[in-house]
Amino acid sequence: SMTRQCQEPNHLVLGYVSTEESCKSVRRFDMIRKTYYLLRRAQRSYGYRTNMPNVIFRKSDFMREQGYQGNLEYVRGEYDFLVNKYALCGDTAVELAPSAWLQQEAPTDKNWHNKSLYLQASRKSLKRNLSMRTLMFFDHLIPHLSLIASIAVLVCSIVMKDWILTGCAGFALLLLIVLRTIIAHRAVACFDSLIPTYKLPFYDYGIIWRNFANKVRYWRADKN
């Protein structure tokens, strides 16, 4: 199925890679969430990078642009670099047919954390980095502001014993969580139907804390 996209004007084809069911569901959720961002960017403009080793590119582009030139100083991140560099050679196609999927082994804790460290180290060399990070920042900021505002109004209304406002704030908070859970379930189910629905709001709102933990690991890592 990937090869059917190998025609003009496409110069790059990105596919999906699933992970073994033994992988922690929160990690499968994180991979799917990142995949949506990266594939959407590839479809709408230029590919930024990929978090999955399922890529087809033109040999002629690879030879003309001197292969991995520009990424030789990094130990990992070759797929990120390939997509970032060769997406500019022409259009990027996305193939999501299940017959084109690959499957990878469940990463160990060490491999999972190292992958995040390698990305943080190499991200500064990727083009179009700012626009992607800005998009993800506001996508995280807005729902968290809504959550904080709903909780704040709920607490204040309880303190003031304004029960009508308490009911409205409680309903707004519940509606926010339910809607985001439904949206997350529909998105995740396209690639992984085994992630428990009741865990999705915790995974969703826990993203910023997992990202912060990754930042701390990077700050503490030996970069020599």
Predicted regions and their residues:
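Catalytic donor/gating beta->alpha subdomain of glycosyltransferases that bind UDP-sugars
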Residues: 6, 12-34, 69-135
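Short alpha-helical "patches" and their helix-cap loops
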Residues: 51-52, 222-224
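Membrane-embedded multi-pass helical conduit in multi-pass membrane proteins
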Residues: 142-222
